[in-house]
Regions:
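Phosphate-binding and adjacent anionic-ligand microenvironments
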Residues: 1-67, 71-75, 81-89, 93-103
Length: 103
């Protein structure tokens, strides 16, 4: 199950998402699963992914600011079912909201 969302974001919020420091992430679970990785760089070449990707054993989400609009995008994938995907969506939005509240 896969889904993409778009939401409004100010320039300041977009910068916070793009420049997230993974050491500031306090969340340990996503959709009931332990978070296995919080990535801001590609594992293969250490290049910036321009946002953040959060991985669990049963799914993941990535959030990144739009380069052309005052918005950000969340990409989600559940390896379980639609209900799990909806929980991923809720938790991903909460994750991004926490990033925005920290600025």
């Amino acid at each position: 199950m896969y889904r993409r969302l778009d939401a409004a974001a100010s320039a300041e919020q977009k910068a916070a998402l793009k420049n997230l420091d993974v050491s500031s992430v306090k969340q340990t679970e996503l959709a009931g699963d332990d978070i296995l990785a919080v990535l801001t760089k590609a594992p293969g070449n250490d290049a910036s992914i321009g946002g953040v990707k959060v991985v669990t054993k049963n799914g993941w989400f990535a959030a990144r600011p739009s380069g052309t609009e005052n918005s950000y995008k969340i990409y989600l994938e559940s390896f379980v079912d639609q209900t799990h995907l909806m929980q991923l969506e809720s938790d991903a939005k909460a994750f991004v909201d926490a990033v925005f509240k920290a600025i």
